[in-house]
Amino acid sequence: YWADLAERYAFEAPMSDITFMGQPQRRILRREPVGVVGAITPWNFPLYLNLAKLGPALAAGCTIVLKPAPDTPWSATVVGRLIAEKTEIPAGVVNIVASSDHALGEMLAADPRVDGVTFTGSTATGRRVMEVASRTVKKVFLELGGKSANVILDDADAGAFGAGILTCTHGGQGCAIT
């Protein structure tokens, strides 16, 4: 999906002109890779979330250092091995660093060689990632906390939401929409 999107997306496409504060503005969409992306993923949905971090970074032309959760390192390790053995992605573009040391995520966020950080997980940890990354003024992309519970109002049509509610796993706390 991401490779196809990168090939067919209209980068460098002019957008419609707008007026802002009384002045005409010319806009253009430009593809500019962030650079080195540090990606920190949680334990739930590990394969999907690792791919959800890798795909956009690679499609944008970035290199990536992926740090999976300490509880689920093998999903990322297998993906890294498949990339190394089955793709033409050059060595060093995708880097997997698995560790049980939670300080590794903080090291990624703080490292001045990392240009952007993406994190999926708890709000408390996301705040810490943002705090540490701000010291080197890098881009930070956060998807935080389980906040997508099903809310069904009294006047809702039961037939309209029946099948959808069955797919709501983890009580809305699964970070699968990253």
Regions found by a protein language model. Name each.
Residues 34-37, 44, 100-107, 121-128, ...:
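Beta-loop-alpha module in the N-terminal Rossmann-like domain of NAD(P)-dependent dehydrogenases
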Residues 31, 48-51, 73, 123-127, ...:
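Glycine-rich phosphate-binding loop at the start of an alpha helix
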Residues 40, 65-69, 97-98, 119, ...:
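Active-site-adjacent beta-strand anchor residues
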Residues 1-54, 89-90, 94, 100:
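N-terminal Rossmann NAD(P)-binding subdomain characteristic of aldehyde/semialdehyde dehydrogenases
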Residues 26-27, 95-115:
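A structured beta-alpha segment of the ubiquitous adenosine-cofactor-binding alpha/beta core
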